Amino acid sequence: MKKAVILFNLGGPDSLSAVRPFLFNLFYDKRIINLPNPFRFLLAKFISKRRESTAQEIYEHIGGKSPILENTKAQADALELKLNENGNHVYKIFICMRYWHPFADEVVKSVKQFDPDEIILLPLYPQYSTTTTLSSIENWQKNAKLECNTKTIHHYYDNEDFIEAHVNLTSKYYKLASKIGKPRVLFSAHSLPLSIIKKGDPYASQIEKTVKLIVKKLNIEDLDWGICYQSKVGPVKWLEPSTESELSRAKDDNIPVVLSPISFVSEHSETLVELDIEYKAIIKDGYYFRVPTLSTDLLFIKCLADLCLDHSQSTDL
């Protein structure tokens, strides 16, 4: 059988000139700003124009573009290799970005040419949210219209290999930080407006469950740890505490910090600029230890492969 795996991710501008249209696509998503048109269209135009220069400055720090597509391609290559190890089926990975190329309508054409017997939808969002997972799946379904058996993986926040991969990386950096003093481990996730959480979005509760499983598996006596949220935009109330405020508190306590980006699985502007430049500057020199994202970690790729294999043999979850 031929099986297509669609890897969903956010996407990112591939040049400085792409920043404004990328931002427009982001804020025009009804799962991000829930307003009827023409108000959502006008607001997306306004926000993308207003934030363009600030966002461009961010991307200038990392070569004038987002590395997310390149990093996702590396994950796709590793996953395709893993899935095709036994040779029972032919798996082909397709990358589908939400707010910049390759868009769903472009990917659908490639999938049709492949002509799979089965399609597996795999968001690169470990924790489910209507703003990420659901938005990507809805957008795919709107564009795909394929008569093909389709399975959807909604989340994997508690997957054993996913947790173990985080434990291994966090433990490594904890040991490094321990040479200075007793570290505080901060698990940083992308924040969301509280209004979305109050409508029943499970994202925050799944973040908490992920972190508690990691902490339990770390098995470090009297571990000092906390959950914090980054990347807030706008004046409304978001999930707290903020990563910035927690880093400031750690600075006041004069302790080393191990920071793990718990909701991101690849490096992009929120990790390479926000965490590695802006937030790092808060902490005393030599006291900041940033755990890398899972990227192509062998256990993480195994996690994704097993999810695909399990869903191929089961009903849609």
From Swiss-Prot:
Q: Which InterPro entries match?
A: Ferrochelatase, Ferrochelatase_AS, Ferrochelatase_C, Ferrochelatase_N
Q: Which residues bind Fe cation?
A: H190, E270
Q: What is this protein called?
A: Ferrochelatase
Q: Which NCBIfam families does the record associate with it? A: hemH
Catalyzed reactions: heme b + 2 H(+) = protoporphyrin IX + Fe(2+)
- Source domain of life is Bacteria
What Enzyme Commission number does this protein have? Answer: 4.98.1.1
Subcellular compartments: Cytoplasm
PROSITE patterns xref list: FERROCHELATASE
SUPFAM superfamilies tied to this protein: Chelatase (SSF53800)
Question: Mind listing the GO molecular function terms for this protein?
Answer: ferrochelatase activity; metal ion binding
Q: Does the keyword Iron apply?
A: yes
Q: Which HAMAP family match?
A: Ferrochelatase (MF_00323)
State its role.
Answer: Catalyzes the ferrous insertion into protoporphyrin IX.
Q: Main EC class of this protein?
A: lyase
- Quick one: a GO biological-process term for this protein? heme biosynthetic process
A GO CC term attached to the entry: cytoplasm
Protein's pathway: Porphyrin-containing compound metabolism; protoheme biosynthesis; protoheme from protoporphyrin-IX: step 1/1
Q: Which family does it belong to?
A: Belongs to the ferrochelatase family.
Give UniProt keywords alphabetically: Cytoplasm, Heme biosynthesis, Iron, Lyase, Metal-binding, Porphyrin biosynthesis
- Coiled-coil boundaries: none
